[in-house]
Amino acid sequence: MQAIVLAGGLGTRLRPLTFNRPKALVPLLNRPQVLHIFDRLPKAVDEAFVAVSYMPDRVRDFFRETDLGVDVTVIEEEEPLGTGGAVKNAAGRIDDTFVVCNGDVIDSVDFPAFLKFHRKNKALASIALREVEDPSAFGVVAMEQGRITRFVEKPPAEKAPSHLINAGRYIFEPEVLDFIEPGRAVSMETEVFPRLAEKGLYGFPFGGYWSDAGTLRGYLTAASFLLADDGAGVDPGAKVGKARLDGAVLIAEGCVLSGRIGPDVVLGSGCRVDAATVERSTLMEGAQVEAGAVVRGSIIGEDTTVGPGATVEDSIVGDGARVRKGRRVIRERMA
C-alpha cells in the first residue's frame, strides 16, 4: 500500500522555529514531527511519498539516514501546489488504493477500521472526520448514511452544516487523481472534494484525540495527547535531584533539574531548569531556564536561555535566543 504525506508548507505558524528547519522536522516529544505521522500509518504501507517545498534537502537527508521499514521518496515542489497539487505530483507512481495524511495533524484515527469502512462502501474517496465545538476554521461536511453530500470550507459557525470537520486523513482510489488538474496549485478542500461529493465521497467519524500541530496551541495540545498516550518518561541519564515533577512529563538524557516541572512538559536532551517553573511547554535540546523564571504554554528553541526571573507565556522563542533577566514575553514570537 502507498501513502502520501503532505508536508509542503512553510511552517509560518511556528516561526521562528521554522526559520532553521522545515516543519516536518520540528521536534515533537523529542522526535521529528513527521515520524509521528509514520507511526500511525496502516501497517500495510510499504511505500510513502513526502511532498515538500521548503528545505527539501533537509527532509531528503533525514529520510536517507532514517530506516523506517518503508520506502520513502521525497517529492519536491518548486512552488507550493496546495493539497491537491501535491497529491497530483505523485500521480505517475500511484497504482492502487492509497492513504493521504496532512503532515500537521496528530491524531488517534484507527486506520484499519478506516480502511475497512472505505472498502465496505466501495468509496472513491473517504475522509476521516472529527467533531469539534467550533467548525468555522475547518472544512465541514453534511452527511447522509455515511456519504458526504456537501463539503463546505471554513463556513461561519452559524451556517456550518454540522460540527464534523475534515481531519486531514484520507483514503483514495487512483481515480481521484483524474479530478485534480495538473500543473497548478489545487486545493482538495475547495476544488476537489465538492466534486467528489457527487461521485462517491464518504466520511469516517472517529473519537479519541486530534490536533493541528502547526500552531502553538495545537502543538502543545498534540504534545499533551502524546504524553498521555504512553509518551511520558524520565531518561535514566537525567539528573532530577530534588526537582518536583507534576503530571505527565518527558525528560531526555543529560537534563539537570531542580525546579518545578509539569504538567505536560517535554525537555530535550541537555536541558537545564534551575529553581524555576515550567508548565505545559516544550524545551528543545540545550535550552536553559534560570532561577526564578516561569515558562508556561510555550515552546523554547534549541540552546535558548530564559534568564533569572523572566516570564515566558503563550509564546514561541527561537533557537539560540536569550530572554534577559526579568523580561516578560507574553504571546510573542521571539527570534
State the predicted function of each range.
Residues A197-G286:
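Extended, small-residue-rich solenoid/repeat segments and analogous flexible loops
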Residues E47-S53, A128-L129, I299, I316:
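Short internal beta-strands
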Residues F98-V99, I106, P112-R119, V132-E133, ...:
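Catalytic-core segments of class I nucleotidyltransferases/pyrophosphorylases
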Residues M1-R60:
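N-terminal glycine-rich phosphate-binding loop and ensuing alpha1 helix
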Residues L25, V140-M143, F193, G203:
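A structural signal for short hydrophobic beta-strand segments in well-ordered beta-sheet cores
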Residues K43, V59-Q145, E181:
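Conserved beta-loop-beta/alpha segment of the NTase-like Rossmann-fold superfamily
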Residues Q2, D46-F49, D71, L124-A125, ...:
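Residues at the starts of beta-strands that form the adenosine-phosphate
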Residues G92, V273-A335:
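Glycine-rich hexapeptide-repeat left-handed beta-helix
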